[in-house]
Swiss-Prot record:
InterPro entries found in the cross-reference section: Ribosomal_eL13, Ribosomal_eL13_CS
Intracellular or extracellular location(s): Cytoplasm
Assembly and oligomerization: Component of the 60S large ribosomal subunit (LSU).
Species of origin: Bos taurus
Source lineage: Eukaryota, Metazoa, Chordata, Craniata, Vertebrata
Descriptive protein name: Large ribosomal subunit protein eL13
Keywords, ordered alphabetically: Acetylation, Cytoplasm, Isopeptide bond, Phosphoprotein, Ribonucleoprotein, Ribosomal protein, Ubl conjugation
UniProt cross-references to PANTHER family, sorted A to Z: 60S RIBOSOMAL PROTEIN L13, LARGE RIBOSOMAL SUBUNIT PROTEIN EL13
Function of the molecule: Component of the ribosome, a large ribonucleoprotein complex responsible for the synthesis of proteins in the cell. The small ribosomal subunit (SSU) binds messenger RNAs (mRNAs) and translates the encoded message by selecting cognate aminoacyl-transfer RNA (tRNA) molecules. The large subunit (LSU) contains the ribosomal catalytic site termed the peptidyl transferase center (PTC), which catalyzes the formation of peptide bonds, thereby polymerizing the amino acids delivered by tRNAs into a polypeptide chain.
């Protein structure tokens, strides 16, 4: 077994019949074909619904390392569906994924996903359960004729990068200490409550002294 990451370098003492227990990878090409056939079978089975599955929300990756990027999440939160005017049980039937555990921590993400839901709803061609008796909200016969199965992802998410022009670095930027500033900001956030408590106690003591 090859050494992995920054662990201790092992001294493997192979006493058992280890050559029979070596993990092989001979099924990789056949597995690739099997996955492709399964994707095609699923696309045929769920047609004319999108082959890639339901609509996913735009979420920001966690941690400082990746939070500049956005990607597809698991499902839309209940608040997003409520603002968009879609019932949580209806959402799953019209190709919208729902994740009741997700919470919206900022207005920007909520608005972006509500807009995404509204855009999807406007583009959606909804087939009636009974072709002879279409209900309110179902697409017209002309729209149904135009319906084709979408092969790629539904409303793909793209990371947009704004290119900055080259310019001269200012003296203020040269003197700015990024790491120290981040440490200070974290410390201030951590000690905010303790400092507020101490300030309150000090103010109370001053009032008592004046009395």
């Amino acid at each position: 077994m090859a050494p992995s990451r920054n662990g201790m370098i092992l001294k493997p003492h192979f006493h058992k019949d280890w050559q029979r227990r070596v993990a092989t990878w001979f099924n990789q090409p056949a597995r690739k074909i099997r996955r492709r056939k399964a994707r095609q079978a699923k696309a045929r089975r769920i047609a004319p619904r999108p082959a890639s599955g339901p609509l996913r929300p735009v979420v920001r990756c966690p941690t400082v390392r990746y939070h500049t990027k956005v990607r597809a999440g698991r499902g839309f939160s209940l608040e997003e569906l409520r603002v968009a005017g879609i019932h949580k049980k209806v959402a799953r039937t019209i190709g919208i994924s729902v994740d009741p555990r997700r919470r919206n921590k900022c207005t920007e993400s909520l608005q972006a996903n509500v807009q995404r839901l509204k855009e999807y709803r406007s583009k959606l061609i909804l087939f009636p359960r009974k072709p002879s008796a279409p209900k309110k909200g179902d697409s017209s016969a002309e729209e149904l004729k135009l319906a084709t199965q979408l092969t790629g992802p539904v409303m793909p998410i793209r990371n947009v990068y704004k290119k900055e022009k080259a310019r001269v670095i200012t003296e203020e930027e040269k003197n700015f200490k990024a790491f120290a500033s981040l440490r200070m900001a974290r410390a201030n956030a951590r000690l905010f409550g303790i400092r507020a408590k101490r300030a309150k106690e000090a103010a109370e003591q001053d009032v008592e002294k004046k009395k």
